[in-house]
A protein has these predicted regions:
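Conserved nucleotide-binding/hydrolysis micro-motifs of P-loop NTPases
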Residues: 16-19, 32-37, 114, 152-153, ...
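Conserved helicase ATPase core of P-loop NTP-dependent helicases/translocases
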Residues: 105-110, 114-156, 175-177
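Switch/connector loops and helix/strand junctions flanking conserved nucleotide-binding motifs
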Residues: 39-40, 156-158, 173-177, 188, ...
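Active-site regions of enzymes building and remodeling cell-envelope glycoconjugates
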Residues: 4-9, 119-128, 214, 220
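Post-DEXD/H (motif II) to motif III coupling segment of the RecA-like Helicase ATP-binding lobe
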Residues: 1-29
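Long, largely alpha-helical accessory region at the distal end of helicase-like NTP-driven motors
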Residues: 220-227
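Conserved segment of the helicase C-terminal RecA-like domain
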Residues: 182-213
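Conserved interdomain hinge at the start of the Helicase C-terminal
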Residues: 40-118
Length: 227
């Protein structure tokens, strides 16, 4: 009677599953990057582009956000600032070096399809006709690097996937869980490493903290990245 009309909902969190030996252990490394101050960033305007820096662009959108006249305007500006930050080249440069340095089987979660194609010879996204072939090569172990956009289908299992790079955390615990879930399918005796790139002294740190709210702090390490 109780089970039928008053079902009990129980949330089984990731760290409990790790502790019980159902999922493999993990380590999350947050790489803190400084916004680039050099005038190499092209800021788009109605008249075209003009040279700016990542720091100036971030401050520009943050100031506009602080002076928003309505809740709707604030929402729009938050999205516009986030999209600008996702396009900053310094994070892409750092991610590419990290990606190429890793010798384990590794997946990179890019922000856009264009970025995924730039970051890796083999990419997986809806506009790439070779996506399924690339995924099969990756699953079968014929290649050890793959870039993708958002998350792969929940049913896709990739054997021996030991490391992952997340370009942007979104501040969304569910999206982060889906991405981290790709790396929690090893043998329970093994450990996966998740790299999250984050701009220091920006709203990006808040997004990362919110995304990882349900994860064990002792498994999370913040390091200063060297550009």
């Amino acid at each position: 009677m109780v089970a039928k009309y008053c079902p009990i909902k129980y949330r089984y969190i990731t760290d409990e599953a790790v502790e019980h030996g159902i999922l493999n252990d993990y380590e999350i490394i947050i790489h803190l990057l400084d916004l680039d101050k050099s005038l190499t960033y092209k800021q788009k305007t109605k008249k075209g582009y003009f040279p700016s820096s990542e720091l100036k662009n971030y401050n520009y959108w943050t100031e506009k956000l602080m002076n928003a006249g309505s809740f709707k305007e604030e929402q729009i500006l938050r999205v516009m600032r986030m999209k600008s930050m996702m396009g900053y080249p310094s994070k892409e440069r750092y991610a590419l070096r990290l990606f190429n340095k890793i010798t384990d089987k590794v997946i990179l979660f890019a922000n856009t399809q264009e970025q995924a194609d730039r970051m890796c010879t083999h990419s997986y996204h809806s506009s790439n006709k070779a996506s399924e072939d690339n995924l099969k090569l990756f699953k079968d172990g014929d290649i050890d690097k793959l870039s993708c956009v958002l998350q792969l289908n929940e049913g896709v299992n990739i054997p021996n996937l030991k490391q992952g790079i997340i370009m942007h955390a979104y501040g969304n615990e569910r999206k982060s869980a889906q991405r981290l879930g790709r790396l929690l399918r090893l043998n329970p005796t093994e450990k996966a490493i998740v790299h999250i790139l984050c701009y220091d002294n920006t709203v990006d740190t808040t997004w990362v903290q919110n995304a990882l709210e349900q994860y064990d702090d002792s498994k999370i390490k913040w390091i200063k990245a060297n550009e």
